[in-house]
């Protein structure tokens, strides 16, 4: 079992895909890492030699910000925006879309499920 940056890579996947299980590494970055150490992307994780795993681990830990560090970095950026009181910070604080999307309709993902408001009571019919 290959464990890199605190994540167990799935054994049956290709290395190229397995690396994308690490937060902060997508397909493009995965290909970039594999080309650095000249490793075939079609190799399965279970077939990786120990020295290749060590090389992957070293490159990822030294050259890239992943997992907890990246999550902390992103949350600190959002907190900074909220602290300085800018428009984007307020939108984050209010759980509204940040990048100019409309909110009169849509924006359900960001705003959460609808909250029903009680309407007028119907008059009893005689």
Curated annotation (Swiss-Prot):
PROSITE patterns noted in UniProt: RIBOSOMAL_S13_1 (PS00646), RIBOSOMAL_S13_2 (PS50159)
Gene Ontology terms: biological process: translation
Pfam families named among the record's database cross-references: Ribosomal_S13
Superkingdom of the source species: Eukaryota
UniProt-annotated location(s): Plastid, Cyanelle
Kinase among keywords: no
Annotated segments matching region Disordered: 100-126
InterPro entries for this protein: Rbsml_uS13_C (IPR027437), Ribosomal_uS13 (IPR001892), Ribosomal_uS13-like_H2TH (IPR010979), Ribosomal_uS13_bac-type (IPR019980), Ribosomal_uS13_CS (IPR018269)
Gene3D superfamilies: 1.10.8.50, 30s ribosomal protein s13, domain 2
Keyword annotations of the record: Cyanelle, Plastid, Ribonucleoprotein, Ribosomal protein, RNA-binding, rRNA-binding
GO-annotated molecular function: rRNA binding; structural constituent of ribosome
The UniProt record lists the keyword RNA-binding: yes
Cellular component terms (Gene Ontology): cyanelle; cytosol; small ribosomal subunit
Biased composition (Basic residues): 101-126
Function text: Located at the top of the head of the 30S subunit, it contacts several helices of the 16S rRNA.
Family listed: Belongs to the universal ribosomal protein uS13 family.
Record-linked PANTHER family: 30S RIBOSOMAL PROTEIN S13/40S RIBOSOMAL PROTEIN S18, SMALL RIBOSOMAL SUBUNIT PROTEIN US13M
Subunit-structure text: Part of the 30S ribosomal subunit.
Xref: NCBIfam families: uS13_bact (TIGR03631)
Protein name as it appears in the record: Small ribosomal subunit protein uS13c
Organism: Cyanophora paradoxa
